[in-house]
Every structure is written in C-alpha cells, then in structure tokens.
Curated annotation (Swiss-Prot):
SMART domains reported for this sequence: CPSase_L_D3, MGS
Residue positions binding Mn(2+) 2: E298, N300
Gene name of the encoded protein: carB
Binding residue positions for Mn(2+) 3: Q820, E832
Cofactor(s) named in the record: Mg(2+); Mn(2+)
Binding site for Mg(2+) 3: Q820, E832
GO cellular component entries: cytoplasm
Pathway linked to the protein: Amino-acid biosynthesis; L-arginine biosynthesis; carbamoyl phosphate from bicarbonate: step 1/1; Pyrimidine metabolism; UMP biosynthesis via de novo pathway; (S)-dihydroorotate from bicarbonate: step 1/3
Organism: Caldanaerobacter subterraneus subsp. tengcongensis (strain DSM 15242 / JCM 11007 / NBRC 100824 / MB4)
Family: Belongs to the CarB family.
HAMAP family: CPSase_L_chain_A, CPSase_L_chain_B
Annotated region described as Allosteric domain, given as residue ranges: 930-1072
Binding site for Mn(2+) 1: Q284, E298
Residue ranges of the region described as Carboxyphosphate synthetic domain: 1-401
Protein's name in the database: Carbamoyl phosphate synthase large chain
Length: 1072
C-alpha cells in the first residue's frame, strides 16, 4: 500500500547525548530516518538536545528543536508544530520511554498525533519483562525461568527455589543499566535494590543464568502488511553473560549449523509478527552449545546498536527503510538504494566476514574494574570487513587505537602463565590477548573452551593466527610467507615487530614481491547485482573490483571509534567536510572504521573506505586513489597523530602544515613560539625524568598542572598538590608518551575561556568566545560553557582576539584552530592550542550560524575568507544564550572517581538555548541531570581548602529556603562561622542518600581517586542513585542562580531555524 495520506508532518525524537549504552548509533539511524522521510515529501520536525551530532543541523530535518526531550517540552512543541505523526523508535531508549509517557499522559490523543511504526502496546510487550515473558509463552517460544519483582524479598524467594547464578535485568533501561549477575544473596540484594531505582517502572526481571551458552542475534524487519525479512545473523564471540555491546560480535554467525540457523531465523520471524513490530527489531537468543535447545533472551522493539552494526555489515540501510515503513510503505515498494535495482524485500547476502570489537574507556580509567558482564562499559566500537574471520579480527584490533597491531602485546607477554589463566577465566577487555598468549604457551584449546565457554571454532581461528606468528618468526620473509601473512590479515607493522625490523622494510619488501591489497565492494547481494554505491574494504590476493578515475578528489581521515575525549563532534566535522567537498565539485573520500556514525553511511561521501586508520592502510588508499591531498584536521587526535609519518611518505596534507601542527603539539616548541610572540603563558618547564620534575616543582611551588604531549581529552592530565603526587604522576606519564616531554605548569586559578577560529593564514575569523563556568583545572570538555562570554572586559576580549590572530598567523593556520585561555586579574594567558577541529566546533557553528567546517575546507583548498564573503575579527554575538553541559556515564563504570579534574571524563554533551542566560543554563542543568528543586534538602561535604568559599554558598542556599545538612568537619566549620547545619556522619549521609532523602549533594574532593576514601564513596553513591552531584562550587552557584531566577513556564521553546533568523539580522553589517 502507498504511504499514509494523512501524514505530511512528522515529529522525530532524537536520542540525546552520547552515554555508554546509547551512543552515536542512534544519531546515525536518526539522521538516516530524517533524510528518508524527506525523500517521501514529509516535513520533519526534530527534538534532540545533543549539539554534537549532524542530526541537529538544519540541513537534516526541516525544523530542529535543540530542547530537552521531556513530556512538558515536547507537548509545547506538538502544540506549536501540530505534527500528524511521531516517530520514536529511532531515538534509542530515550525515544521509546518518551513515547510511552506521551501516550499515557494523553498528549498524543489530545493533539491527534499518530504514533508511527511500532505501537505503544508492542513497545510495552517487548520492554516490560513480565508481559514479554507471557507473550513468548503464548506463542510457544522458550524463555528462561524467571520472575518479575518490584522488591528485594521476592527476588530472594526466587533465588531460594532456583539457586545461583542469576541474571538481573531492569525494565525500560539501556545498556544493561542497573543489571548484573548475582552469585549469592548479598550480590542479589545489592543489584536488585539498585536496578529497581534505575527502572522507569520500578521493575526488574530475575532469571536463571544461561551463562556460557552461545549468544546469537537476528536483525529483522517487518512492514504493516506483515511482510518479514531477516537482515543479518550475528554471533557474539563471548558467551551469554557479557552484554552484547561489550562483546566481540561477528556477522554473519559463524558456528551455527544450517538447522540451527533456520530454527532461530524462523523463531525471529514468529516473534516480530507476534509483537506486531513495524520497522526494525533486534532479537537475542541463548543457544545451548551441546544441543539444539535455545531461549529468547530479549527483544529491542526499535533500531538499536546491533541495527547500526547490521546496517554497516550488510549495506542494508535499516533505519532508512524503517522510517519508510513507519509512514505506511511496504518492503516491496521500497527500492534498495545500494543496488538501485532490487527492492528492500530482499534478504542481504554476505561474501565476507564482519567483526565488531568494543572500545572501552579503561585507558582513561585505569583504576576501574576491567571485568565485563551484563552492564555495558564500552563507549564505542570499531568494525572491520575481510574475507576470513582471522583477517577481519586482526583488522578490527588495529582499528581500536590501543597500540595493538596484532594479538601480541608486550605487557601480556611479560605475564606469568598462572596470571594469564586467571585473567582468561573472567570476561575482561583484554581477554582476547590473554587467550592468544595462552595458545602461544601451548595451553590446550579444550581447557580454554572449558574455562571461557568461547566456541572452539573461534579458538581454533585464534590458534591459526598464533601459528602464523610462529611461521613468520622462524622463517625468512619469502614471497609465499608474506603473501600468506597478508592474506590472514597481518599488518606490516606486526610482521616487522615479529621480525625485529622496521615497518617500512616490510612495506618495501611487500612492494618488491608485488603484494598489494585488492579492494572489494559491499553490495548487500554477494555480487549478484552491481552496486551503485562506493562502499569499499580491502583484502589480499583477490581480484580488485574498484576502479579509480583521474579526477580531482580529496581524502578525509575520520576519527575512528568513539571514546572519552574524541566523540561524535569529530564525526560531525568529517561529514560536513565531505559535504563541503561535494559542493566544490571535488570527489570526497572518507577513511573510517566506526559502524555507529554518519560518516560511514554508504552515501555520505562519494567513496567510503571502511578501513583501519593506520599508516599502512591510509598509504595504500592514497597510492591507489592519487588524490589532490589528505585532510587531517577533522579526525581528532587519530588523524593528527598520523600526520608526521604521512608527510615522511610524501603525502600532501591540505590545510595547516605538519610543521605548524608539531609546534602546537610539542609543548617545548609551543612555549618558545609564545615567548617570541610576547604572549603570556603559565610559568612552567619540561621533564623527561622524575628528577627534572622535582627541580621544576622547587622553582614553581604547588599546585601544579601536569600533562604529556600528543594526547586528547586531557588524558593523564592532573592537578598535583604535593611532591609525592608529582613523582607518582611523572612515572605514569612517561609510560603514556615515552620519550615525550611532560609539561609542568604553575596552576592558574582563573576563569577559563575558549575560542574556535577559521584562518586562511592572513585573515582570522572568530565566530565567538566561550566562557567556562568552572575555573581552570577542570577539563574544557567537562566544563559548563557559556556563549556569548558574560564576564570579560572589553580589554580582555581585545587581548583574546589579538592573541588568536597572532598565533594563527604565526602558525600559518589554513583551516580551524582552537585556543584555550585563562584570565586572572585582567591578565590573559594562553593554555593550549589545537590547530584542528575541536569538540566545540559543532556547538559554535549552531550557536552562531557560521559554517566553520565549510569555510575551513574552502580555505584548505586555497580560497581566502574574503573571497568567501567573510571578514576577520570577532563575529557579532547573538542576542540569545547557549550553554553547553557535559554528560557523564559514571553509573556504568564502577570504582571511577567522578569529581571534575583536568582529565576529561564526560562521554557526551547537551545544549541549553534560550533568549535569557538563566533560561539556557536551567535547560542545560536539567538536560545534564543536575536539576535541583526550588526547595529541598542539600548535603554538603567540603574539602578544607574550599571552606571559606563555601560560606557564601551556604548563605545563598539558606536565603533561598533550602535545608542544609553537612558532614562533621564541614558542619563544624559552619558552626564556627555562625551558620546552622544538620550535622551527621558520612556513613549515615550515604545511607540516607540511598533512600532518596537528599535533593542534591555538594562535595569537593580532598584526596579523591581512592575507592576506600569516604568522600569517594559519597560521590559514587550520589551517581549510582542518580542524585544531582556538584563537585565544583562554581557549578552549584550557577545552578542556584538559574533555579532562583527562572520561571519554568516562561522559558522560550524556539526552533534553531527561528534562532538563526534572529542572528541573521545581527550580522547584516559584517558580511561583505
């Protein structure tokens, strides 16, 4: 049937900020859905409070609201825009939960808005654990023994009858939030108690553990006419018990017999039909390795992380098709955009193997528990495509950017066998490398299978890789051996390491033997039909299917997997760069390996190479394509770190030169430049050893700010207050960046200010100046930032402009540059310069309307800003305010210090925008989970150094009518100052916190970092029980200011289109 006649305007709910469990895959699917609806002539209204995604650009949806997706706000948008339908199944758990609330509040009926795609009844049946269990039993599909509980006592009764281990899964949550595996009563009580608080409906499922069974997933599509197809089967390398988001996943499933495959495929189709899901759906099964017995684990009645992986693995655009199904189209009426010939009612066929490996944040949080289980901890993932499992796995490993180019890691090889065997027995982020090492030490495959429950098929494949390592080690690098190694997926660098030679020697030998990669197309149909899209992967010793043409083209290097410090902001920049190249008539080529992102969609660039971002892989593509040059400024530190080696291999870098990048990244060279330019910088020095560091500390005094070179997200950056802290730090930092100097600066206790600019080497355009709410010493990615800056004098603003121009010209920047300043007592200091796209480019582009990435691309290609219609200097500031708030995923990462510091910890961000400053700040606080009520109970536990400053805070709290509670030392100090507070012990405060007694906690850390520290426990409890936590007095003061002055009903709900119209009037006099 054709699309619904009465649907001409659709409201799409976006997924909000990037958090563990709900990352960029929803931005990718949401973006694809918006484009898909517009293709059908539907007007699209979007609600999403994430400024970092391309989805919230006005190019994607027709009308964009960067507002918090709450029932109250969305009702206002519905009343204003009057959409005919609402699409919620592409916004992750945020979208689903909101759709259910809107329906239950009667808002959809009140405004006659049709819920498109899957109905609320179907969502509830899939998401509510008890309803789901009943539905499966009704259709004869097996589910594990389980009980839905709303209290701890019922969970303990179930445990008494069925024994341990048990798996706990809360209803209506994502990424396994609040779930876990309990092995005894104590663990069960703890997990269920927390899970009940995390569940939107106060329910958890307690089920008999199927730990050790195979976990198999099917991605299925269904339309309103009951047509169904399976898109892809996927197999988890790790058995049941590890969250699929934390598991290595292979597509198609590798170890199923044809009987097992058909059995689970039939069950998948039966389930999607019974649930009446319209669109995409992910079904997870547990399969007994010893029989054909299986259980249905769960169903996601929406596009999910696995859907994004299945889309990229097959080339079948699930979200695009799901959006068309939602407005009434049938699968056989929708064209497959990859082949251009077949319809979407066509099951994809794969003639290659896809491997996904999660990217965990443990390089940032080396104190956290590295074990993985039912609660997800990965921030992102990589995907690789090859012709065999071995080659696909090795390609994925080197895409992770964890300094692993194969399965041999020095840190693992130095471990004792007993330790290796212990680490194999528990799932953790390094288990793949431990298993490889066990195989090297001739540990029996049966034993490893028995301990890990990983299928022997996978273990035999790992054994093949280990045997190949041995063959390389023991023989001359003949043509045959090199060919065999390359075909198995070994990188030049790994072969060089095994042989103890240089990577370039292997590359030279490989070329001498005539061993080059061949490139293949992803076409959804195993080459049965010709592909019209350019979605490419490499392999060895096969026919090359990819033709190159002698036309102007440019390679954009992507940013790889999402991790803390390098999020989707960089994917936003890569996508904008590809579009800008297309506009100039130059063919755009992207190299990236992240299956969650828009940049790796089959039609974003003219050509997509789904490959690791390593020197070898980039050089191979460069030599094949022969482009005008390569752009590294949009791919974050991933691309920047490759620049030196690319230049050595005569690759032309478009934009700022490597020499300039090196000056800004090398702290010593950069300091010298600032001195020459007569620009203020914090006093400091450079240390290569602990002794150097001690000498500098003696000269400068404490506190000090210490950081290594060439890192992102402030990795390993700390504020140190004592000599011992400094010694411990330098020892660790030299491991992160060996041979690179450690920068030691005198800490400046001032306001932090940030600028993004576009430079053509002569003219410098500054779209705006952002001011941080928190003082220096908090990483810029973790600060609340305000645009336009509110507390700078005219003289300070002029100095910031002058310094930005001086530095941009001295470095001959051709493109984007980001500069961070500290301002103290009227003096402006330069803290850091990044001559590339920064994480604030998307939010500043949206706030000001300046197309920063487009200008940077044009400038890199040789144009001048004046030719493009822009003058230098500071762009007129907006008459509205934008506030960027960080969003953290700390509840998923146990034993991690949550207080703000120089090292970045946030996984995402949200934006508050309003005609008033207080309104924008209020929205930002609410979106970041830091909304405090106008009255309530506030707990304070303050470090001694902050006592004085806390007095004015407490006076403000009391004047606003809050009840003050304080821990002993804090309360005692307040008493001395004549301030009344209810005083209690920390242990009692933590107990009350768990029971939801307090409305907010203010805790500035003393020592921090140590899990046995009482303050650490207080902060962790606040995070785990979702109580607003403030670890900076600056943030809570700003929050009180917003809460006390804002009339919530008076907040403006304007679209970005309306804000941009307001700003256009502002700039008329500046544009040439």
């Amino acid at each position: 049937m054709p699309k619904y006649k009465d649907i001409s305007k659709v409201l799409v709910i976006g997924s909000g900020p990037i958090i563990i469990g709900q990352a960029a895959e929803f931005d990718y699917s949401g973006t694809q859905a918006c484009k898909s609806l517009k293709e059908e002539g539907v007007q699209v209204v979007l609600v999403n409070n994430n400024p970092a995604t391309i989805m919230t650009d006005t190019d994607i949806a027709d009308i964009v609201y960067i507002e918090n997706p709450t029932v109250e706000v969305v009702e206002k948008i519905i009343a204003k825009e009057r959409p005919d339908g609402i699409l919620a199944t592409l916004g992750g758990q945020t979208g689903l939960n909101l759709a259910v609330k809107l329906k239950e509040a009667g808002i959809l009926d009140k405004y006659n808005v049709k819920l498109l795609g899957t109905s609320v009844e179907s969502i509830k049946t899939a998401e509510d654990r008890e309803l789901f269990k009943r539905k499966m039993q009704e259709i004869g599909e097996p589910v594990a023994e389980s009980v839905t509980v709303t209290n701890v006592e019922d969970a303990l009764k179930f445990a008494k009858n069925y024994g341990y281990p048990l798996i706990i899964r809360p209803a209506y949550t994502l990424g396994g939030t609040g779930g876990g595996i309990a092995h005894n009563d104590e663990e069960l009580i703890s997990i269920v108690d927390l899970g009940l608080k995390k569940s939107m409906v106060g329910e958890v499922l307690v089920e008999k553990s199927l730990y050790g069974w195979k976990e198999i997933e099917f991605e299925v599509m269904r339309d309103a006419a009951d047509n169904c197809i399976t898109i892809c089967s996927m197999e988890n390398f790790d058995p049941v018990g590890v969250h699929t988001g934390d598991s290595i996943v292979v597509a198609p499933a590798q170890t199923l017999s044809d009987y097992e495959y058909q059995m689970l495929r039939s069950a998948s189709i039966k389930i999607i039909r019974a649930l009446k899901i319209e669109g995409g759906c992910n079904i997870q099964f547990a399969l007994d390795p010893q029989s054909h017995k299986y259980y249905v684990i769960e169903v996601n009645p929406r596009v999910s992380r696995s859907s994004a992986l299945a889309s990229k693995a097959t080339g079948y655009p699930i979200a695009k098709i799901a959006a068309k199904i939602a407005i009434g189209l049938r699968l056989d009426e929708i064209k497959n955009p990859v082949t251009g010939k077949t319809t979407a009612f066509f099951e994809p066929a794969l003639d290659y193997v896809v491997t996904k490996i999660p990217r965990w944040p443990f390089d940032k949080f080396y104190t956290t528990d590295r074990r993985i289980g039912t609660q997800m901890k990965a921030t992102g993932e990589v995907m690789a495509i090859e012709r065999s499992f071995e080659a696909s796995l090795l390609k994925a490993v080197r895409s992770l950017e964890i300094k692993a180019y194969g399965l041999r890691l020095d840190s693992v090889r130095g471990m004792g066998t007993k330790e290796i065997l212990e680490d194999i027995s528990v799932p953790n982020d390094m288990r793949l490398f431990y298993i490889a090492e066990a195989l090297r030490r001739n540990i029996d495959i049966d034993y490893i299978n028995d301990v890990t429950k990983i299928d022997k098929w996978f273990l035999n494949k790992l054994s093949n890789i280990v045997n190949m390592e041995k063959e390389i080690e023991e023989n001359e690098l003949s043509k045959e051996i090199l060919k065999k190694a390359k075909r198995m997926g070994f990188s030049d660098r790994e072969i060089a390491t095994i042989k103890g030679i240089k990577e370039e020697d292997v590359r030279t030998l490989r070329k001498k033997y005539g061993i080059y990669p061949s490139y293949k197309m992803v076409d959804t149909c195993a080459a049965e039909f010709e592909s019209i899209t350019q979605y490419i992967y490499s392999t060895y010793c096969e026919e090359d299917e990819v033709e190159t043409h002698d036309i102007p083209k440019v390679i954009v290097i992507g940013s790889g997997p999402i991790r803390i410090g390098q999020g989707i902001e960089f994917d936003y920049c890569s996508v904008k760069a590809l579009w800008a190249l297309k506009e100039t008539g130059i063919k755009s080529i992207i190299i990236n390996n992240n299956p969650e992102t828009v940049s790796t969609d089959f039609d974003t660039g003219d050509r997509l190479y789904f490959e690791p971002i390593t020197l070898e892989d980039v050089l191979n593509i460069y030599e094949k394509e022969k482009p005008l040059g390569v752009m590294v400024m949009f791919g974050g530190q991933t691309a920047i770190n490759l620049t030196e080696e690319l230049v050595k291999n005569e690759v032309k870098i478009l934009g700022t030169s490597f020499k300039s990048i090196d000056i800004s990244e090398d702290r010593e060279k950069f300091s010298k430049l600032l001195k020459e330019l007569n620009i203020n910088q914090p006093k400091g020095g450079y240390a290569l050893t602990v002794e150097d560091a001690k000498d500098i500390a003696l000269k400068l005094g404490f506190p000090l700010l210490v950081r290594p070179s060439y890192v992102i997200g402030g990795q390993s950056m700390e504020k140190v207050n004592t000599l011992q802290e400094l010694i411990d730090y330098v020892k660790h930092a030299t491991e992160v960046s060996p041979g690179k100097p450690v920068l030691i600066d005198k800490y400046i206790d001032g306001r932090e200010v940030e600028v993004d600019a576009v430079s053509d080497g002569e003219c410098v355009l500054i779209p705006g100046i952002m001011e941080h709410i928190e003082r220096t010493g908090v990483h810029s990615g973790d600060s609340f930032s305000i645009y336009p800056a509110r507390n700078l004098t005219e003289r300070e603003i002029n100095t910031i402009i002058e310094y930005t121009e001086k530095i941009s010209k001295a470095l001959n920047v051709k493109g984007l540059i980001n500069i961070q300043f500290a301002v103290k007592e009227g003096t402006v200091y330069v803290l850091e310069v990044n001559p590339r796209a920064s994480r604030t480019v998307p939010i500043m582009s949206k706030a000001t309307g300046v197309p920063m990435v487009k200008l940077a691309v044009e400038v890199a290609l040789g144009k001048k800003l004046k030719e493009l219609g822009y003058k230098g200097g500071l762009w007129p500031q907006t008459p509205y305010t934008v506030v960027k708030a960080p969003v953290f995923s700390m509840e998923k990462l146990t034993d991690v210090e949550v207080s703000l510091s120089p090292e970045m910890k946030s996984t995402g961000e949200i934006m508050g925008i309003d005609l008033s400053y207080e309104g924008a700040l209020y929205k930002a606080l609410e979106g970041a989970g830091l909304k405090i009520p106008k009255k309530g109970k506030i707990l304070l536990s303050i470090a001694e150094r902050d006592f004085q400053e806390a007095v004015s805070l407490v006076e403000k709290l009391q004047s606003l009518g809050y009840e003050i509670y304080a821990t002993y030392r804090t309360g005692k100090y307040f008493s001395l100052m004549g301030i009344h507070a209810n005083i209690m012990s920390l242990d009692h405060a933590i107990k009350l916190l768990k029971n939801g007694y307090f409305d907010a906690v203010v805790n500035t850390p003393t020592k921090g970092k140590k899990p046995d520290n009482a303050g650490f426990k207080l902060r962790r409890t606040a995070v785990e029980y979702r109580i607003p936590l403030f670890t900076s007095i600056d943030t809570i003061k700003a929050a009180l200011n917003a809460v006390s002055k804002v009339n919530v009903n008076g907040l403006s709900v304007l679209s970005m289109n309306e804000y941009q119209e307001i700003q256009k009037d502002n700039v008329k006099n500046l544009v040439l």
